[in-house]
Amino acid sequence: MENWYAEIITIGNEILSGKTINTNASHIARRILSLGYVVRRITTVMDDIEEISLVFKEAINRKPKLIISTGGLGPTYDDKTSEGLALALGVSFEINKDAYEMIVEKYKKRGLPLTEERVKMAKMPAGAAPVRNDEGIAPGIYILHKDIEILATPGVPREMENVLENFIKYHLKNRPNISYYENSFLLLGVMESTIAPYVKELVKKYNLYIKTHPRSKEMDKPELEVQVAGSSTDKEEITRIVNECINELKQIGTRLGGRVQEIM
């Protein structure tokens, strides 16, 4: 089965300082995982053109199928993603006609002038295409580079989510012929260290991703969320295998004195 690797880049000093929790990376990862991609790396860098350029270059050199960035597409001085991406690709940084028209229309509807800061959101790497942003002003940026699809999204979560969906619907050219499926349940009264050797054996048996997520302290009324996930070109087959593994884990948990609870 061909590897459909993806990388996620988050850009912003506010994330590195701990002021903002990086929920965008989590959303993007879950969404593209549902399409069949495997996220190999999530990287966060500061609002610096050289840093942004370097992280894009490094990602491109690893040759994933897809790179998605979030943050740094607004009108302020520290929104530098677009320029950093242009530098990484070795292309000019220029006003994109289609993006410019999108921005003109949005400000015109509001009766607002087109300032230098607002025009800045129309500047993109040469050869890029704007991705519609129905929740804000700055469009996303899509570019195909050496068979790698690259998307840059704004950092505001609702804008990122909207741009990501518009990208998937209207721009994404290649996607895996792979189905992803996961299921999970709660196991109460069994410590993670107790079930760990059984999990290790089932990973070998089923060739699936099995993860126990503690929801409480190990020694004090242990509670685990047990997650099982896998990918395959056959949707029905991977669903069957994951659920078979889930059932075996439930039986093991019960034998170990635990209580199974479904997640609603």
Curated annotation (Swiss-Prot):
Pfam families per UniProt: MoCF_biosynth (PF00994)
Name used for this protein in its record: Protein Saci_1508
Top-level division of the source organism's lineage: Archaea
Coiled coil: none
Similarity field: Belongs to the CinA family.
